[in-house]
């Protein structure tokens, strides 16, 4: 049984957060994947304390990506996701909002936060690989995009005759695979 104090979304005030450091600190503390880049960050405040954050990244005009949602890990935050999302929908013009759920944590495509917010299942995204380096931080995954051969050659002087995997191994990185994603769309 969860013994953390309850906070209800209906008692929260929603505000746009313009200070990225506040958003990054909150996400690093309360989201399993930590911070990410964003265009708009909305905060849920209860008695002037930040208890929830939802971030959106503008892909192109009218197309958005809901890329992070987190609540204070020391509280049961009920209804805050819905309140933050409704605020975005009411106040920011959009054609489509997409979001991706990690299949390690989201298995039911019909009964989860996305469907409760009005998103519809779009597709499964196949598994892909990431890198991590236990000497740097064993808990942080690095996206494969930063490990392209040309990039590693330019940054570290590694010969282009090596494969990406050989280059990353030489640099102390290990390749790990995820379970894929579930893509949701809100129109």
Task: List each model region and its residues.
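Alpha-helix termini
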Residues: 92-94, 131
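A conserved beta-strand-loop-helix scaffold within acyl/acetyltransferase catalytic domains
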Residues: 4-92, 101-112, 116-117, 121, ...
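Flexible loop/N-cap segments at domain edges
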Residues: 97
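A conserved mid-domain beta-alpha-beta active-site/ligand-binding segment of alpha/beta enzyme cores
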Residues: 146-184
């Amino acid at each position: 049984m969860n013994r953390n104090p309850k906070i209800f979304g209906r008692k929260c005030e929603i505000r746009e957060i313009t200070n990225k450091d506040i958003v990054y600190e909150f996400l690093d503390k309360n989201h399993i994947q930590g911070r990410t880049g964003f265009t708009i960050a909305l905060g849920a405040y209860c008695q002037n304390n930040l208890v929830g954050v939802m971030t959106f990244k503008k892909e192109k005009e009218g197309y958005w990506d809901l890329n992070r949602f987190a609540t204070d890990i020391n509280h049961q935050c009920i209804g805050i996701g819905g309140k933050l999302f409704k605020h975005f929908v009411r106040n920011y013009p959009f054609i489509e909002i997409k979001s991706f759920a990690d299949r390690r944590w989201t298995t039911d495509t019909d009964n989860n936060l996305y469907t409760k917010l009005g998103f519809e299942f779009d597709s499964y995204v196949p598994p892909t690989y990431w890198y991590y380096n236990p000497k740097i931080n064993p808990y942080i995954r690095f996206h494969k995009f930063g490990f392209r051969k040309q990039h590693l050659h330019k940054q570290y002087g590694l010969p282009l005759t090596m494969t990406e995997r050989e280059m990353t191994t030489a640099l102390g990185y290990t390749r790990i695979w995820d379970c894929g994603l579930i893509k949701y769309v809100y129109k």
